[in-house]
Amino acid sequence: MTVSEFPDTQDKQPSIPISLTRVGVTGVKKLIKIKREDKRPIILIPTFDAFVDLPSTQKGVHMSRNPEAISEIVDEAANQSEIHLENICANLVKRLLEKHEYALHAETEARGEYIINKLSPVSKRKTQETTHIIARAIAMKDDEGNISVRKMIGAEVIGMTVCPCAQESVEKDSKDKLLEFLDEETTQKVLDVVTFASHNQRGVGTILLEVPEKQDVNVDDLIKIIQDAMSSPVCEILKRPDENRIVTNAHQNPVFVEDCVRNMVIGLLEKYPNLPDDSVVTIKQVNQESIHQHNAYAEKVASFGKLREENKE
């Protein structure tokens, strides 16, 4: 029997005529090879989720069309000289609306691990660092069949933070003890050259940036902005001179969880001064505390227009 000869159960009327917001597939893994001029290609194995809405007049979606659309778009991307994961998602949501003619809304998300090659700060040993990248896209179809697309690219990066509050307490305590046997001038000279202890956190910074379909954002830029927002980047391979450099630098740049989010805001505004005002960004920082059982959290969600207004104040 051909496909057309089998009954199409999905097209039947549902017994309960209620529309559904999202129906689709999750956890579809694909290999993507991103070509780079004069460089080795980047290999990603992202996991895709893909959904469409379902009207109240239809029993079910044609589920096989979703993984079929994912395979088609990924295969087409393999022949392109430059491709971004968020553009794959943007193309995918448009393809989903083509395949599901009854749908008015399509949404997809892709998550994967992105490997960055770097050198340790002093010994210059080669190391690979893993970051998580997230891409999403949403497509809407109006009454005339016109499709509009918004896409999002994001990164989640691990770094190190140092608590400013505890460090100031340690400095004050050290100063009081030094003044017991040193004069004020000598004590200040000691304080000026000593790096004071504090408690540390493993920080996890996230930027999710939503932009129009024709606007491109480099995920490497987002990764650097997140790294620079914390007290120090981290590195997988560290010899003792490397450890000393990272720990010293981090303690010379203490930041609260709130500071990290604000630093990311400034980094984005400086790197992308021409992004449209309606571009929406979500910035999150989670610091995994070393002296508490809880973690510290801060977040900012705003349009670029709003961020520009606040930064002028």
From Swiss-Prot:
Keyword terms, alphabetized: Hydrolase, Iron, Metal-binding
Source domain of life: Archaea
Catalytic activity as recorded in UniProt: GTP + H2O = 7,8-dihydroneopterin 2',3'-cyclic phosphate + formate + diphosphate + H(+)
GO biological process, one term: tetrahydromethanopterin biosynthetic process
Example GO molecular function: iron ion binding
Keyword Iron: yes
UniProt keyword Iron, yes or no: yes
Site (May be catalytically important): 163
Pathway: Cofactor biosynthesis; 5,6,7,8-tetrahydromethanopterin biosynthesis
Cofactor binding, per record: Binds 1 Fe(2+) ion per subunit.
EC code(s) of this entry: 3.5.4.39
Known cofactor(s): Fe(2+)
Complex and partners: Homodimer.
Family per record: Belongs to the GTP cyclohydrolase IV family.
Function: Converts GTP to 7,8-dihydro-D-neopterin 2',3'-cyclic phosphate, the first intermediate in the biosynthesis of coenzyme methanopterin.
Name of the protein in question: GTP cyclohydrolase MptA
Organism, as annotated: Methanosphaera stadtmanae (strain ATCC 43021 / DSM 3091 / JCM 11832 / MCB-3)
Gene: mptA
